[in-house]
Amino acid sequence: MQIEDITIDTEEIQLDQFLKWAGVLASGGEIKALLAEHRIKRNGETESARRRKLHPGDVIEIEGMGAWRVARD
């Protein structure tokens, strides 16, 4: 699976903000649904908190959609 780097200009970003910033998902409702279905993983582990703080190097994978790495500018 190819991982796309998404650059942020802060030290950390919340999961829900990151997915919207990356253009992966448009709303918090979409994120909540995917979390409830256990389809989002952070660094290979199933994620359950939409406000989880992400840092450069973290990889987010959504089953059936792709993978994105938090990168720092």
Model-predicted regions and their roles:
Residues 3-5, 37, 59:
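Low-complexity, intrinsically disordered short peptide segments enriched in small/polar/basic residues
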Residues 1-13:
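A detector for short, charged/polar N-terminal pre-domain segments
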Residues 14-56:
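A basic, amphipathic helix-loop patch mediating RNA/tRNA/ribosome contacts
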Residues 47-73:
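C-terminal structural segments of small proteins and small subunits
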